[in-house]
């Protein structure tokens, strides 16, 4: 599933091609995504793109009439292509632009979303979200106070969007390894120093992944069709049985909340 770095990579890739151009119309080939494509998107006509923003794993296209909210789901990607390039089997939505380009949404599993909203503060998919991990709001004091009394294992706790947004399975595993914290420790067991270390580690891991264009494990592609290269730098995720890059002890895996977790028992405490 595309996580925050992949969504931010997509945002940065499409922004120069959209802002200042006008959406002439939308082409919806299959509206049956996680939720049906909003009827307002079907009816789009002559709407200039004012900005391309991101909140958590949602891309937000600001138009004079409202906002398009895009979620990439499990397997979605966005590419900027020539308008005359024929659509393929899993190309479900196009935004045809005034500059001769098209923003094309591809999603083999169809678990993404294209929604319409006139007031972001009232959006049901955005209103409950916690702070952005790269913002000043996500601080050592915030994370430490938030963890008090929480018996939940720290890894699934970090993946709760009410705690912090955009830290999915890959980056939670990687950040906990770099911080030296076992993923099954209760969140309430974090010391204030460990909370600070974890915050700085999460920020660093996410920023490094964004610099590398995200992580491509299966379906994710950047807006130019290239894969993300952070997969080559993964320390523990997907490496069960392989030697730890620090101590050579085999990487272990376990299940937390139906998701695989990867860690080094020697390097993490």
Curated annotation (Swiss-Prot):
Q: What's the cofactor?
A: Zn(2+)
Name of the protein = Formamidopyrimidine-DNA glycosylase
NCBIfam families membership: fpg (TIGR00577), PRK01103.1 (NF002211)
Q: What is one Pfam family matched by this protein?
A: H2TH
Q: Which domain of life is it from?
A: Bacteria
Q: Would the keyword Endoplasmic reticulum be found if you checked this record's keyword annotation?
A: no
Taxonomic source organism: Erwinia tasmaniensis (strain DSM 17950 / CFBP 7177 / CIP 109463 / NCPPB 4357 / Et1/99)
What is known about its subunit structure?
Monomer.
Active-site residues are 2-3, 57, 259
């Amino acid at each position: 599933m595309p996580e925050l770095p992949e969504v931010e990579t997509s945002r940065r890739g499409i922004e120069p091609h959209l802002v200042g151009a006008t959406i002439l119309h939308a082409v919806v080939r299959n509206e049956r995504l996680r939720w049906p494509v909003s009827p307002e998107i079907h009816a789009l006509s002559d709407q200039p793109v004012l900005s391309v923003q991101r909140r958590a794993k949602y891309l937000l296209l600001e138009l004079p009439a409202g906002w398009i909210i895009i979620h990439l789901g499990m397997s979605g990607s966005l590419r900027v292509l020539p308008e005359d390039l024929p659509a393929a089997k899993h190309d479900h939505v196009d935004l045809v632009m005034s500059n001769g380009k098209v923003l094309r949404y591809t999603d083999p599993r169809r678990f993404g979303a294209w929604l319409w909203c006139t007031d972001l503060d009232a959006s049901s998919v955005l209103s409950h979200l916690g702070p952005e991990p790269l913002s000043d709001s996500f601080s050592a004091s915030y994370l430490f106070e938030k963890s008090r009394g929480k018996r939940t294992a720290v890894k699934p706790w970090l993946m709760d969007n009410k705690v912090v947004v955009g830290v999915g399975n890959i980056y939670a595993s990687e950040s906990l390894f770099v911080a030296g914290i076992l993923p099954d420790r209760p969140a309430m067991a974090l010391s204030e120093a460990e909370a600070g270390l974890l915050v700085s580690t999460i920020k660093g891991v996410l920023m490094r992944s964004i610099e590398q264009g995200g992580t491509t494990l299966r379906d994710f592609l950047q807006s130019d069709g290239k894969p993300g290269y952070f997969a080559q730098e993964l320390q523990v995720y997907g490496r069960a049985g392989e030697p730890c890059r620090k101590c050579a002890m085999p990487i272990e895996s376990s299940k937390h909340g139906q998701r695989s977790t990867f860690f080094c028992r020697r390097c993490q405490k």
